[in-house]
């Protein structure tokens, strides 16, 4: 959650606006605001506060790390009834003018008072993209990990079932972020696929869970790549999870290949703004 700016006073907030946001994370120090750093949340807050002419409290569905992208991040902002009168068209045009060119608000919803993009999310989905070949990706290079060596997708897929269900994922969490915090999460889906982007064949790993730990997806990918390189067997994934120790897992995959793909909410909660 991002704290409000030091404006005069905050009015009575009777409803919530929810924004679907896309961004290229290459130039940002992550989503969450940090002193002296350029962040996605900082740019969004400044743009929205400029339009509303007051401080806001901004909550996101998931805080992405530096260099991670999003096609459907969600943020919620409490607003007044009067501010709900601003039309969808007005919001989209204003945000297009006020935000940097690598951040876009693509949809605006209204929701009940107290709705939270974070706490009302039922699941989040991430996709990691890998170019596992010796030819450099060109047009897709900013959103993939160029691995240079082919990976055994069948072996990596065989390791994925171990990730499913509710369990302790401490082995995949950045050590400092796990201290004194719960590390159990529930993963509903983890699977490999392929897509073509700008004529380039890309290997994809998609994962859906109720929530994710700091660097969890990237460390899972790094662990799977160890298996895909035949350095480890698929059964190793179970050993890594059971260890509950970051040193048991593989390296953290580069941020550039990870994209926050979307969030599942109760459809009745969000109504597209007129």
Report the location of each language-model feature.
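Structured-RNA-binding interfaces characteristic of tRNA pseudouridine synthases
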Residues: 2-274
């Amino acid at each position: 959650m991002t704290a409000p700016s030091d404006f005069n006073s905050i009015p009575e907030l009777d409803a919530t606006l929810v924004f679907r946001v896309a961004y290229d994370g290459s130039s940002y120090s992550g989503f969450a605001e940090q002193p002296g750093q350029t962040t996605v949340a900082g740019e969004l807050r400044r743009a929205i506060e400029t339009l509303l002419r007051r401080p806001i409290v901004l909550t996101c569905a998931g805080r992405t790390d530096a260099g991670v992208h999003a096609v459907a991040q969600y943020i919620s902002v409490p607003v007044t009834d009067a501010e709900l009168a601003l039309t969808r068209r007005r919001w989209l045009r204003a945000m297009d003018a006020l935000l940097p060119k690598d951040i876009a608000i693509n949809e605006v919803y209204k929701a009940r008072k107290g709705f939270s993009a974070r706490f009302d999310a039922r699941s989040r989905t991430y996709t990691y993209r890998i170019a596992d070949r010796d030819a450099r990706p060109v047009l897709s290079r900013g959103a993939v990990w160029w691995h240079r060596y082919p990976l055994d997708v069948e072996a990596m897929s065989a390791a994925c079932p171990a990730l499913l269900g509710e369990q302790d994922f401490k082995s995949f969490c950045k050590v400092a972020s796990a201290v004194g915090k719960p590390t159990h999460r529930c993963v509903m889906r983890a699977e490999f696929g392929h897509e073509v982007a700008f004529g380039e064949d890309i290997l994809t790993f998609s994962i859906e869970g109720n929530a994710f730990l700091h660097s969890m997806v990237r460390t899972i990918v790094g662990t799977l790549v160890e298996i895909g390189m035949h350095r480890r067997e698929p059964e190793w994934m179970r050993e890594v999870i059971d260890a509950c120790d970051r040193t048991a897992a593989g390296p953290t995959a580069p941020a550039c290949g990870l994209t926050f793909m979307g969030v599942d909410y109760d459809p009745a909660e969000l109504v597209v703004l007129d």
